[in-house]
Each structure stands twice: as C-alpha cells, then as structure tokens.
C-alpha cells in the first residue's frame, strides 16, 4: 500500500499530500504517524504535492491544527478530502 498523505498527530485536522498528481475523485491513503495507522477517503479536489487536505469536516470559525499547532481558522466550511489553503483558511494573527 502506498501512502498519499501524512498526518503527524491524530488530533491534527489536516494531512499533507506527499505524492504528485492527486486528482478529484481519487481514493487516498494517509498515514497517521503518532498512531502508526492508516486512513482512506476520497479526495474532493486536485491537490498539489506539499499542500494540505482536510482529514475530517471542518466548520466555519473552527481552528485548524497541523503538526499539533494552530495554523489558523476556517473561513469557509471544508469537507473531508477538500484542499485546505488560503481560500478557506486564514491566519489568526491579523
């Protein structure tokens, strides 16, 4: 089984895509590192390597956690498998 995305901590809200060519509709396999387990779901968007995807549904105003760190807040609801980027997450710094 090949790994398509990595999640560092089970409490994270996002994973990081580690392969090229991810297209909408693909079934992806992710590795949750701290629990050494995998999860699978269908990706909703094309997502470039190195970018984030939601590993669960995220509601507007929810905090996004990556690597156990608060990286911002959701400004538009995000479904599991969607691209998480500047169009739907904003920093809390300003």
From Swiss-Prot:
UniProt entry keywords in alphabetical sequence: Cytoplasm, Lyase
SMART domains: SAF
EC class name: lyase
MF terms in GO: sulfolactate sulfo-lyase activity
Subcellular location: Cytoplasm
Domain of life: Bacteria
Residue ranges annotated for the AFP-like domain, each copy included: 16-90
Keyword Cell inner membrane part of the UniProt annotation: no
Coiled-coil stretches noted in the UniProt entry, renumbered to this chain: none
Record EC number: 4.4.1.24
GO cellular component term of the entry, any: cytoplasm
Recorded catalytic activity of this chain's protein: (2R)-3-sulfolactate = sulfite + pyruvate + H(+)
Complex and partners: (2R)-sulfolactate sulfo-lyase is composed of a SuyA and a SuyB subunit.
Function summary: Together with SuyB, desulfonates sulfolactate to pyruvate and sulfite.
Protein name, per record: (2R)-sulfolactate sulfo-lyase subunit alpha
Organism, scientific name: Chromohalobacter salexigens (strain ATCC BAA-138 / DSM 3043 / CIP 106854 / NCIMB 13768 / 1H11)
Taxonomy of the source species: Bacteria, Pseudomonadati, Pseudomonadota, Gammaproteobacteria, Oceanospirillales
Gene symbol of the encoding locus: suyA
């Amino acid at each position: 089984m090949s790994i398509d995305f990595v999640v560092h901590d089970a409490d994270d809200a996002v994973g990081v895509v580690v392969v090229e060519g991810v297209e909408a509709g693909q079934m992806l396999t992710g590795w949750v590192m701290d629990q050494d387990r995998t999860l699978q779901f269908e990706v909703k968007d094309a997502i470039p390597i190195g970018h984030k995807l939601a590993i669960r549904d995220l509601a507007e105003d929810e905090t996004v956690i990556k690597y156990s760190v608060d990286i911002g807040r959701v400004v538009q609801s995000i479904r599991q498998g969607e691209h998480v980027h500047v169009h739907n997450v904003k920093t809390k710094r300003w």
